[in-house]
From Swiss-Prot:
Keyword S-adenosyl-L-methionine carried by entry: no
Family: Belongs to the RapZ-like family.
PANTHER family according to UniProt: RNASE ADAPTER PROTEIN RAPZ
Positions contributing to ATP binding: 8-15
Function (record text): Displays ATPase and GTPase activities.
Gene3D superfamilies referenced in this protein's UniProt entry, alphabetically: P-loop containing nucleotide triphosphate hydrolases
Pfam families: PapZ_C (PF22740), RapZ-like_N (PF03668)
Signal peptide as annotated in the record: none
Keyword ATP-binding (UniProt): yes
Origin: domain of life: Bacteria
GO molecular function annotations of the record: ATP binding; GTP binding
Record protein name field: Nucleotide-binding protein TERTU_3824
Disulfide bridge partners, by residue number: none
């Protein structure tokens, strides 16, 4: 049996996640009262269906808001730890406010005495036990609908089919750190193609920039050091029942060096892991994860 607990703040994409998982063959149950979870797990674990896959949505609308008991209920049940996973979707307060303003939907915790700001904060506190216990946290603040579906498919569905998922994400430090990174490597010390007028408008995906960086000794040293580090430590995470890993590579603008290094490292690790992808945050047409 495969059990996914899907949770997150309203407006962060939980419904989208459940719809995608349903399309992928999961039986989805939204807003299940926590107290009913043990009985459901018991029933499903003894089902005649071969390897049932179930996704359960749990959020702050729950009849019993004491969600701190959720993990204890699962842990004392019949499922081994590797059979279930907690997925938590979140967004920044500013993004949630904007989304509610655009859709003009009412927040589920809003009432005549609670404004939207207070409802969002109250929901964060209620869901804290789940967010703290999450195996996978997806920040959807900068994701559109297509990108969110791609991220869920990569992090959750992809790991079902192909073992551990590894994502290399390039970014520009001037635009902020990726909040979902497990490792961050800074390649700003490497020679910068930006200062070559002929390369400035090209990206790290272009043959000209690749040729420029391939010829630099520092680039080779950085590449080999990161690759050696990842090959040593990724198996340790995998042995600890980790299903995904996000490795962020940053340069100043996120357009040349970080893109080049992410692509090259992903290509090398593809020999060891089937589900290796890249995402280049500062290149708009490559925002969805791509197989290397």
């Amino acid at each position: 049996m495969r059990l996914l607990i899907i949770s997150g703040r309203s407006g962060s994409g939980k419904t989208t996640a459940l719809h995608l998982l349903e399309d992928e063959g999961y039986t989805c149950i939204d807003n299940l009262p926590v107290d009913l979870l043990p009985a459901l797990i018991e029933q499903l674990s003894t089902s005649d269906r071969p390897s049932p896959r179930v996704a359960i949505g749990i959020d702050a609308r729950n009849i019993n808001n004491d969600l701190s008991r959720l993990m204890a209920m699962i842990e004392v049940g019949p499922l081994p730890r590797e059979s279930y996973q907690v997925i938590y979707l979140d967004s920044s307060r500013e993004v949630l406010l904007k989304r509610y303003s655009e859709t003009r939907r009412k927040h589920p915790l809003s009432d005549g005495l609670t404004d939207l700001n207070e409802a969002i904060e109250r929901e964060r506190i209620i869901l804290e036990p789940i967010s703290n216990a999450a195996d996978v946290t997806i920040d959807t603040s900068q994701l559109n609908l297509h990108e969110l579906r791609s991220a869920i498919k990569y992090l959750v569905v992809g790991s079902d089919r192909e073992g551990m998922a590894v994502l290399f994400k390039s970014f520009g430090f001037k635009y902020g750190l990726p909040v979902d990174a497990d490792f961050v490597f800074d390649v700003r010390c490497l020679p910068n193609p930006y200062w070559d007028a002929g390369l400035r408008k090209l990206s790290g995906l272009s043959p000209e920039v690749i040729a420029f960086l391939n010829g630099e000794e520092q680039v080779e040293e950085m590449y080999n050091d990161i690759l050696t580090f990842m090959r040593k430590w990724i198996p340790r995470f995998e042995n600890n029942n980790r299903s995904y890993l996000t490795i962020a590579i940053g340069c100043t603008g996120g357009f040349h060096r970080s893109v080049y290094m992410s692509e090259r490292l992903a290509k090398a690790l593809k020999a060891d892991y089937k589900n290796v992808q890249t995402r280049h945050r500062q290149i708009p047409d490559s925002s969805a994860p791509k197989h290397s």
